């Protein structure tokens, strides 16, 4: 029997000219992770920062929790974009509702109307979750999320998943917000049709 020795292959070295030819690669590597050396509390960030990989994603993300236990995800801009889209949609709906009201109400109470409508759309209740599950087949083992189709044993666990879904790398709350906005528009359209029908019958 011959003795085989393990061959160690040397790693390829990147020359300075190659690095200067591809500055985008180095800039992306430099901006992908936060620089812990520049911060004053570098040790604390090293303790509170972890690398997180969701089960559905092939990518890993650098996640940090600060002193107030707020979650910050580096390298995952989709969450912020989705949240931003949801907030923009809410602001557009609020603007439409304010514009549809009378001019006197716009001049006197625009901020209060914005706050009330935004708070109503932002809070997802158990009734909203049950209403969204009507379009899905009835589940015997628990409750199914209408956004990500995951099963949860109790309604409380599903509600907590919707509220804190951004910690898992995505947000089902945006989906339920949009559903609630659509339901509000449908309800307004139905009430408007009823009022128009009532006025037509009165004229007849």
UniProtKB/Swiss-Prot annotation:
Coiled coil: none annotated. It comes from Mus musculus (Mouse). Its main location: nucleus. It is found in: Nucleus membrane. Testis-specific. Transmembrane segments: none annotated. Residues 101-120 are annotated as: Disordered. The keyword Membrane applies. Plays a role in spermiogenesis and fertilization. It comes from the Eukaryota. InterPro entries: Spt46-like. One of its GO terms (cellular component) is nuclear membrane. Disulfide bonds: none annotated. This is Spermatogenesis-associated protein 46. Keywords: Differentiation, Membrane, Nucleus, Spermatogenesis. One of its GO terms (biological process) is spermatogenesis. Disruption phenotype: Deficient mice develop and grow normally. Knockout males, but not females, exhibit subfertile capacity. Deficient mice are characterized by abnormal sperm head shape and a failure of sperm-egg fusion.
């Amino acid at each position: 029997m011959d003795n085989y020795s393990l061959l160690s292959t040397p790693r390829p070295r990147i020359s300075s000219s190659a690095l200067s030819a591809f500055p985008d690669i180095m800039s992306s590597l430099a901006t992908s992770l936060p620089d812990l050396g520049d911060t004053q509390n570098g040790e604390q960030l090293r303790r509170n920062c972890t690398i997180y990989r969701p089960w559905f994603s092939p990518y890993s993300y650098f996640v940090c929790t600060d002193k107030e236990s707020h979650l910050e995800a580096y390298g995952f801009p989709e969450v912020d974009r989705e949240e931003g889209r949801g907030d923009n949609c809410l602001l557009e709906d609020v603007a439409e509702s304010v514009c549809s009201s009378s001019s006197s109400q716009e001049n006197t109470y625009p901020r209060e109307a914005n706050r009330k409508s935004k708070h109503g759309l932002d809070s997802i209740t158990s009734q909203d979750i049950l209403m969204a599950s009507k379009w899905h087949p009835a589940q015997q083992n628990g409750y199914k999320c209408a956004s990500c189709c995951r099963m949860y044993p109790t309604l409380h666990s599903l509600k907590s998943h919707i509220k804190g879904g951004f910690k898992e790398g995505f947000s089902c709350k945006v989906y339920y917000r949009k559903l609630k906005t659509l339901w509000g528009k449908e309800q307004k359209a139905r009430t408007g049709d009823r009022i128009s029908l009532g006025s037509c019958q009165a004229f007849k």
